[in-house]
Amino acid sequence: MWELVTLLGLILAYLFWPRQGSSGTKYPKSLPSLPVVGSLPFLPKSGHMHVNFFKLQKKYGPIYSFRLGSTTTVVIGHHQLARELLIKKGKEFSGRPLTTTVALLSDNGKGIAFADSSATWQLHRRLVLSSFSLFRDGEQKLENIICQELSALCDFLATCDGQVKDLSSSIFMTVVNIICMICFSVSYKEGDMELVTIRRFTTGFVNSLSDDNLVDIFPWLKIFPNKTLEMIRKYTEIRGAMLSKILKECKEKFRSDSVSNLIDLLIQAKVNENNNNSSLDQDSNLFSDKHILTTLGDIFGAGVETSSSVVLWVIAFLLHNPQVKKKIQEEIDHNVGFSRTPTFSDRNHLLMLEATIREVLRIRPVAPILIPHKANTDSSIGEFAIDKDTNVLVNLWALHHNEQEWDRPDQFMPERFLDPTGSQIIVPSSSYLPFGAGPRSCVGEALARQEIFLITAWLLQKFDLEVPEGGQLPSLEGIPKIVFLIDPFKVKITVRPAWKEAQAEGSA
């Protein structure tokens, strides 16, 4: 009996005790660690994780590590080290850890967001990027799609003149429809079941993936009932059922001479692959239905809550800083006027608006901690060795709030992104990576920048958004899920008199 206990103890010690490198190998400083549980007892139990990691930096330095179960995780909180990881050694650290929750969400590592580095991931990512080329010109031009949805949004908000509303649902619908037009050339209306379904699974994933999941540290816990896993499984099934129906419909009407959206591109790639190698089984080939559905699901996950959240953060900070909102509206009035709507090319003239968006992305990054990277091989960051299969976190919050890089980093100061004359956009620090960088950078960065700029410009051209009478300013604390969400808030919507007059003159 005692021999068995001793043997079990030795096995656990071997599996969970921190590894020691060869003589002379220098590893990042580590939090204390215990067998089995690792550093779990020594991590802060309350507060936002990105803030806690930033505080730990002051004790352990800009790169340090901790252990959870048998896994070592390195945290990076300085832009030079982050750029080395993401860009200079991007391929070496392009892997993704396959945790229990991620495996369930991504159908065991398919798609592009959570897939490990592989030929399949590279191909799907390349196709998603190339799909944007379908929307460069003509009626399908990306900007036209965005403006079409913005026209519907503003028409609706005009009917709410003088009312107090939470804008989140309206902005969500606008962004969803832009994504749906890119993915499968469909736009939904308020109340459509598909729109309700999309909201249900995107919100469900954001909430369930952000819990502290012990099952990701100790995978054997999945044999027990787990609320988080049940939620992910439920929303994965809901998403799969909807997207499978759409994929089936798109396959039936697919024409190789009329590829017009992302799902067409993926179907075309599947047809080409089947023609070239029909012996592959359904699940192993690069474009199985499962691969296509997971990639489409990733586009919704990466593209909807992110852009929607940033727009709401911009509005919230402008409510807190009405003098900035006034400057932006004066800028729009002078450079755009009321005879037309803002275009993306106006970004060169609407500098205070562009600076404000950049400042919001700094002070409240979409993802305060980037999705974890994994070392594909033994490597190094700075002067420190990083073993193969080590997880690496980039703490964007630390980069964007470093007092040595930013003047008063906790203060909202859009002017920091303008030159002293206010006539040119500048990047005041290299410690700024709102969309990540390198092989794992956000595939939808260009789309997100257009969406955020145009949505904000259109809203501020046409409406005054103010704190409701007797109401409170929005909380700027935030809710750190997989996306940094803002607490719900309401605004009073007033159609701007100058816009109303211009519309009346135009219809006369």
Curated annotation (Swiss-Prot):
Binding of heme, residues: C442
Enzyme Commission no: 1.14.14.19, 1.14.14.32
Broad EC category: oxidoreductase
Keywords: Endoplasmic reticulum, Heme, Iron, Lipid metabolism, Lyase, Membrane, Metal-binding, Microsome, Monooxygenase, Oxidoreductase, Steroidogenesis
Pathway in which the depicted protein is active: Steroid hormone biosynthesis; Steroid biosynthesis; glucocorticoid biosynthesis
Record has rRNA processing as a keyword: no
Signal peptide extent: none
Main location: endoplasmic reticulum
Control of this protein's activity: Regulated predominantly by intracellular cAMP levels. The 17,20-lyase activity is stimulated by cytochrome b5, which acts as an allosteric effector increasing the Vmax of the lyase activity.
Catalytic reaction annotation: a C21-steroid + reduced [NADPH--hemoprotein reductase] + O2 = a 17alpha-hydroxy-C21-steroid + oxidized [NADPH--hemoprotein reductase] + H2O + H(+); progesterone + reduced [NADPH--hemoprotein reductase] + O2 = 17alpha-hydroxyprogesterone + oxidized [NADPH--hemoprotein reductase] + H2O + H(+); pregnenolone + reduced [NADPH--hemoprotein reductase] + O2 = 17alpha-hydroxypregnenolone + oxidized [NADPH--hemoprotein reductase] + H2O + H(+); 17alpha-hydroxyprogesterone + reduced [NADPH--hemoprotein reductase] + O2 = androst-4-ene-3,17-dione + acetate + oxidized [NADPH--hemoprotein reductase] + H2O + 2 H(+)
Entries under Pfam families matching the protein: p450 (PF00067)
Domain of life assignment: Eukaryota
Database matches in InterPro entries: Cyt_P450 (IPR001128), Cyt_P450_CS (IPR017972), Cyt_P450_E_grp-I (IPR002401), Cyt_P450_sf (IPR036396)
One GO CC annotation: endoplasmic reticulum membrane
Molecular function terms, GO-annotated: heme binding; iron ion binding; lyase activity; steroid 17-alpha-monooxygenase activity
Cofactor(s) of this protein: heme
Subcellular location(s) of the protein: Endoplasmic reticulum membrane; Microsome membrane
GO biological process assignments: glucocorticoid biosynthetic process; hormone biosynthetic process; progesterone metabolic process; steroid metabolic process
Function: A cytochrome P450 monooxygenase involved in corticoid and androgen biosynthesis. Catalyzes 17-alpha hydroxylation of C21 steroids, which is common for both pathways. A second oxidative step, required only for androgen synthesis, involves an acyl-carbon cleavage. The 17-alpha hydroxy intermediates, as part of adrenal glucocorticoids biosynthesis pathway, are precursors of cortisol.
The family this protein is said to belong to: Belongs to the cytochrome P450 family.
Name this polypeptide is given: Steroid 17-alpha-hydroxylase/17,20 lyase
Organism, scientific name: Cavia porcellus (Guinea pig)
Gene: CYP17A1
